[in-house]
Amino acid sequence: MFFAVDAAIGGGISIADETADGNLMVKPFKLALAQSPGELAGPRARVDWLAATLSGIAKQKADLLVLPEMFLSGYYIGDAVHDRAEAADGPFAREIAALAARFGIAVLYGFAERADGLIYSAAQCFGPDGARLGGHRKLAIPPGFETGTYTAGAGCRLFELGGVKIAILICYDSEFTEPMRHVAGLGAELVAVPTALSAEWDWVARTMLPTRAYENGLFLAYANHAGHENGLDYLGASFIAAPDGRELARAGSGPEVLLAEIDPARVAAARARLPYLKDRKGLKLDAG
């Protein structure tokens, strides 16, 4: 095994194997998504659950595990969020970073971030060496209990893992066309969407978000909770979608781990076949 440059993914460095005939075979990027139980208690129980889950998927050689919105703290927890919020480098964050390094799997998870006296609905990713690769603060705060509790974030950034360019959007962010289109324009090939979607919003997970993958020509990992939390019924229905909008994996309503191999070359192929991102620039929207 050795390192080779893969032109199909924009010159990024990928681990490649040599086949019997001497050709290069790029190591596939294996994506895991965990639909975690909503009934889990506080951060301690959730980190313990994560450790057990990572132990299981390590056997599958996963490169990245995506977890739901507010995985660490719990989502529908009322005023308890003030006690469970922590800094991006807080004690539980350090434990999660250590787990990522222990199992050699990048971990992307949602949490309540405390910074400068404010609380954000945030997500961050630790790489397989435990180093922080990137993070995101929820841009759009929906009506309801989140308003007045969380401060809206600003900006979207990409990070790279295994030759794949990754962006994070959180739940409601992804329901607007603009953020998804923005990160696609930045070059995102995979968008991770930690979410906390209740059962009444079924069509968002089954129709709207696969369409976001299709219209932007990218992979999309939508990670929801399962079961119940303090009277809130989660939909489940987490999924991984390809750049053509097709489902690579779809969860039911209970706790589940999804696995899919993603090939960034499919992003370029999808965007060439239906060049929405390029052709939209020529649209004349003003009448004058």
Region roles according to the model:
Residues 73, 124, 136-142, 239, ...:
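Short beta->alpha transition motifs characteristic of CBS
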Residues 26-31:
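Extreme N-terminal starter segment of soluble prokaryotic enzymes
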Residues 88, 114-189, 198-207, 269, ...:
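Active-site catalytic loop in hydrolytic enzyme cores
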Residues 2-3:
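Aromatic (phenylalanine/tyrosine) cluster motif
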Residues 40-128, 198-218:
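Cys-nucleophile CN-hydrolase/nitrilase-fold catalytic domain and related Cys-dependent amidase chemistry
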Residues 88-108, 175-258:
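CN hydrolase (nitrilase-like) catalytic-core segments centered on the catalytic cysteine
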Residues 13-24:
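Short, Lys/Arg-enriched N-terminal segments with co-localized hydrophobic residues
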Residues 109-111, 122-125, 157, 238-240, ...:
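Short beta-strand scaffold segments in enzyme catalytic cores
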